[in-house]
Amino acid sequence: MTTIGTPLRPNATKVMMLGSGELGKEVVIELQRLGVEVIAVDRYENAPAQQVAHRAYTISMLDGAALRALVEKEKPDFIVPEVEAIATATLVELEQEGYNVVPTAKATQLTMNREGIRRLAAEELGLKTSPYRFVDNLEDFKQAVAEIGIPCVVKPIMSSSGHGQSVIKSEDQIQQAWDYSQEGGRAGGGRVIVEGFIKFDYEITQLTVRHVNGTSFLAPIGHRQEDGDYRESWQPQAMSDLALKRAQETAERITTALGGRGIFGVELFVCGDEIIFNEVSPRPHDTGMVTMASQELSQFALHARAILGLPIPEIYQISPAASKAIVVEGKSNNMTFGNLDKVLEEIGTNIRLFGKGEVNGHRRLGVILARDENTEKALAKAERAYAKLAVQL
């Protein structure tokens, strides 16, 4: 039987979030609704999840000693990584000492870089993937591009939100792609993956939740990427029964191999009825923000339940829905969001502003959510709302 204590009391049920971005913020809110005491950690102060947590700490989570000291100080019941840039070797040690890492330290370690998860998927599980090479230097990079062929995709093995990712469409872009990959890695320059360019009909996120009663699947989420970063998503994505069955089978195989409890974002390419594995995140997925409009229990609420060992009897979809990321470009630490009365004037429209303190370049600062009778209308509604938003830097 699962029990939950009282926050800020000796019997509190404590969760430590490692990473405090917009996805972590929603998880913190859901955990607090269940009476959980939450500690939010990030590498910079006043990150979104830190703004709604009971306590916040700012450290380099790649510093194993600092991470261990913080865990030993707080003694959380659950450690929940929300980003890739973490000292995963320390998490493995902490798990061996009895701490509960969500979903598992192994899952966090394997998925913190693209090499670990790609080798698990392709070489151990035999899942279909794009052709790939891993390289450490410019000379090997040029050779890998020659072997894979142009066009090809280049990504740092450790990055997120499209940072350091590019598509090589001609030979004169090889040096530029290498330089960009070295600037965009979460832990600095270094190893990259060169992937063959996949021709696909569409791509989906198959959100999969492993919980106390087994494994459940959310309706597939379609999405559009730009520069390797999510811009729009919608749920459900129309697909054949066979393709959906294969997507769920692929998702179950990879999440079973990773183990533990929680939500996983399994990224897949779909070509006809064929499924090609791309990546997996052992945490809520940015494209899954649409579930805040589409489902009775969002991906964040499902993650909170799974972490705590609470039952998930059914995943119920309220309505077709869409999301559109609010991406701002410029430089400011004093942003203002205006014209909200117009943004929210249509029924079934909502907005989430993440509370990020600054932008320097381009940054996702919020998301528009919309419901309608089908995903096409929901997406059009979200785009209309987005067009009315005025962001002043």
UniProtKB/Swiss-Prot annotation:
SUPFAM superfamilies assigned: Glutathione synthetase ATP-binding domain-like, PreATP-grasp domain
Enzyme Commission identifier(s): 6.3.1.21
Reactions performed catalytically: N(1)-(5-phospho-beta-D-ribosyl)glycinamide + formate + ATP = N(2)-formyl-N(1)-(5-phospho-beta-D-ribosyl)glycinamide + ADP + phosphate + H(+)
Residues that bind ATP: R114, K155, S160, S161, G162, H163, G164, Q165, E195, G196, F197, I198, E203
GO molecular function: ATP binding; magnesium ion binding; phosphoribosylglycinamide formyltransferase 2 activity; phosphoribosylglycinamide formyltransferase activity
Chain positions recorded as N(1)-(5-phospho-beta-D-ribosyl)glycinamide binding sites: E22, L23, E82, D286, K356, R363, R364
Family statement drawn from the similarity comment of this UniProt entry: Belongs to the PurK/PurT family.
Function description: Involved in the de novo purine biosynthesis. Catalyzes the transfer of formate to 5-phospho-ribosyl-glycinamide (GAR), producing 5-phospho-ribosyl-N-formylglycinamide (FGAR). Formate is provided by PurU via hydrolysis of 10-formyl-tetrahydrofolate.
Protein name, as recorded: Formate-dependent phosphoribosylglycinamide formyltransferase
Gene from which the chain derives: purT
